[in-house]
């Protein structure tokens, strides 16, 4: 990376406007709290808006620090995939015997329903 610092006038202006806007909204809520119709909700907002302004400045500061730091070296000796013996084996479904009486009875019932449906022409599918 280069050793010269980048100048970001548009970003600095955006952060400054955002922080000043948050402080102005905090001042507005403070004056609303002090008025005759002010509530504790206005006080809460009056205390929150300066925190939002501080958050704008904090995130800009972190952005600049992150951008100026050198990129982290990639470790090529890292494991890129999970070894198959690390995970437990997936359970397999039990095989039904082909002469299962309950399955045979159920299939017969389904065949009767299909036959009745075909006789009555009550098709619900296209």
Swiss-Prot record:
Extent of the signal sequence: 1-19
GO cellular component: plasma membrane
Lipid-substituted positions (N-palmitoyl cysteine): 20
Swiss-Prot/TrEMBL keywords: Cell membrane, Lipoprotein, Membrane, Palmitate, Signal, Transmembrane, Transmembrane helix
Domain of life: Bacteria
Lineage: Bacteria, Bacillati, Actinomycetota, Actinomycetes, Mycobacteriales
Similarity-based family: To M.tuberculosis Rv1343c.
Lipid bilayer topology: Lipid-anchor; Single-pass membrane protein
Transmembrane segments: 44-64
Membrane found in the keyword field: yes
Keyword Membrane part of the UniProt annotation: yes
Name used for this protein in its record: Putative lipoprotein LprD
Subcellular location: Cell membrane
């Amino acid at each position: 990376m280069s050793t010269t610092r980048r100048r970001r006038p548009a970003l600095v202006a955006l952060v400054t406007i955002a922080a000043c806007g948050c402080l102005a909204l905090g001042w507005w809520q403070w004056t609303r709290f002090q008025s005759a119709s002010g509530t504790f909700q206005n006080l809460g907002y009056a205390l929150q808006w300066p925190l939002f302004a501080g958050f704008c400045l904090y995130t800009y500061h972190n952005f600049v620090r992150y951008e100026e730091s050198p990129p982290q070296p990639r470790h090529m000796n890292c494991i890129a995939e999970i070894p198959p013996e690390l995970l437990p084996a997936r359970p397999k479904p039990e095989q039904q015997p082909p002469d299962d009486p309950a399955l045979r009875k159920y299939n017969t019932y389904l065949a009767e329903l299909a036959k009745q449906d075909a006789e009555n022409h009550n098709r619900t599918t296209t």
